[in-house]
Amino acid sequence: MMRSLKSRKLVFILAMLFLINAIVSLKFITYSSANQLASKSKYIEYNFENKSVSPLAKYPSNVVLKVTNSTCAEGTFSVLVAGRKNANDGVIVDITKFLDFSREYEVSFYVLQTTKKLQRISVTLEILDSNDKNQVIAAEKVLLPNIWTKVSAKVQASNYKKAKRINLIVNMPTSKSDSFYIDLFTIKDLENAYVLKQENFENKNTGGFLPEDKNCKITLAKDRAYSSAYSLKVQPSQKTKNGKILFPIKGLLQKGGTYDFSLLVYQDSSKPVNFSAGIKLNDGKSTKEIVLAKQNVAPKKWTQLFATLDLDTRFSAKDVSFFVKPAAAISYYLDLYSISDENWGQPVPDYNLPSLCEKYKNYFKIGVAVPYRALTNPVDVEVIKRHFNSITPENEMKPESLQPYEGGFSFSIADEYVDFCKKDNISLRGHTLVWHQQTPSWFFTNPETGEKLTNSEKDKEILLDRLKKHIQTVVGRYKGKVYAWDVVNEAIDENQPDGYRRSDWYNILGPEYIEKAFIWAHEADPKAKLFYNDYSTEDPYKREFIYKLIKNLKAKGVPVHGVGLQCHISLDWPDVSEIEETVKLFSRIPGLEIHFTEIDISIAKNMTDDDAYNRYLLVQQAQKLKAIFDVLKKYRNVVTSVTFWGLKDDYSWLRGDMPLLSDKDYQPKFAFWSLIDPSVVPKE
């Protein structure tokens, strides 16, 4: 059922269909309806269409649970969780009887909150044995207002073989009294976790299907069913002849998602009848139907109708329903309706998230460093465009990438960054022109002897010529296209008496190369902003050396426009007060801009096998990042750009350190939410 992620188009693509006419041996997952449970079923669903709140129970007794048709993720009904008096109030579900203790399960449900602010939903496993009661947070999700959101928790049942009872507790700890809604509660083993919805009508209700025409009758039927006792019978009015039925699905759909719809159709007229299936959209002003599948259904044969829907990342509609419609005014039957998520198990971002760069548009640019592969990945591209208004090529503009051998400039990939930024109105930071790493050895090799250059005047001239040619060729090519350059990178070593790193650049040219680099870059593009960039700028000794370097260069009239503070840090170091001291120091240099160029916060060395403690570390990471941003906002007159060194954790140069805003699956961490709304980040 899985397939690789496809390019998202500007409008959502309505994709392929295939139909199987005479079905002889269809294979469906084992299914249990809500009131006919099998203890080891692979898929269990409660959709509340029977108007019962089961299996949800009050937690505690003051909570009010009510089935309502005022809103739903799918079908017709959901459960309102009201009467809350405490942040821990919510619902509890005893899931013990559903579990085979040799399997791993996904427990999921859809939740909606209608307050005017962000809220956090929490899912806790409560494990009770003969001696003890233990609670473990199984899932947490930040909810935007008025958007149905899927919340999933994995339960490794084999870890709890000695448990007498396992409860699932759902609450909204960011609010003591606000109500919320729950719909489509499912328990399924991981083999079937891609299934979002399945209806076989054995729950003795119409499963949330609705007739488009109020004169059309839909009822349960025992005279026709594919494999069990019941199916859904549709009888259009002979007056209106409208046999179209609808199934509301808006809450199930995620922007950028891919969904498979499958159902069985049976009709017993005297000839084949064409059936169509698709989606009906309502934007609040008008409706539109889009057919996903058409098929002739032969008489007296169950026929599978299958269609796939791809949603664009900008998809929006007030209401969405799946529809089935015969071309003739005949009675017909439906059975085994299902919706599957083709992207399950694959990383898919939440395209409803608030935009970071929009949040900070009145403070500074929000940037990200990305490798070239991100520009070729449509999912990465959408994330970049939503959250960032500045990008830095991670390695693609470093000397070894642009001039791997003398005179052999290679601009094709760097040009793609320029084209990408121009197309999407994103600013481009160039990184970096001069560095002691990722610079080809030929820069420092005598072209005649093959020996390493020395500090002789002749060799100095060779290296200066190479430096000038490289800078002016690169900066000149991107004149007016790169708004800021990290001209010189990491030239300071606080352990040296004079503070200069003993790199090949320094050993051959002395500190002169720094000054020359800025002058030549300015000549090539007088409007580009030129930065000195370095790490550990929070170290008092190092920042003092950098401060003196920049102040001296500016005193000589060298065109240095800003300092880049990399900010590769950890939970333990530095203290946020040192970051503020660094900003304060450089803000004393008149006209100097400050860019935070490579932010990440490593937590790896603190991590353990204890999930609760690791969650605590993620909270600490978020709180530290929030404190840093409080400082940066305070100095917004000089801090003009803030860049994160990576799009998500597995793209980071510190891959195992979980240092960025999103996890490997694009899911926002507490660090992200600390910059959007700190109130949803746990306090502990």
From Swiss-Prot:
Residue stretches making up the GH10 domain: 350-678
Pathway: Glycan degradation; xylan degradation
Reaction catalysed by this enzyme: Endohydrolysis of (1->4)-beta-D-xylosidic linkages in xylans
Superkingdom of the source species: Bacteria
One Pfam entry name: Glyco_hydro_10
GO molecular function, one term: endo-1,4-beta-xylanase activity
InterPro entries the record matches: CenC_carb-bd (IPR003305), Galactose-bd-like_sf (IPR008979), GH10 (IPR044846), GH10_AS (IPR031158), GH10_dom (IPR001000), Glycoside_hydrolase_SF (IPR017853)
Keyword line: Carbohydrate metabolism, Glycosidase, Hydrolase, Polysaccharide degradation, Repeat, Signal, Xylan degradation
UniProt similarity note: Belongs to the glycosyl hydrolase 10 (cellulase F) family.
Name of the protein: Endo-1,4-beta-xylanase A
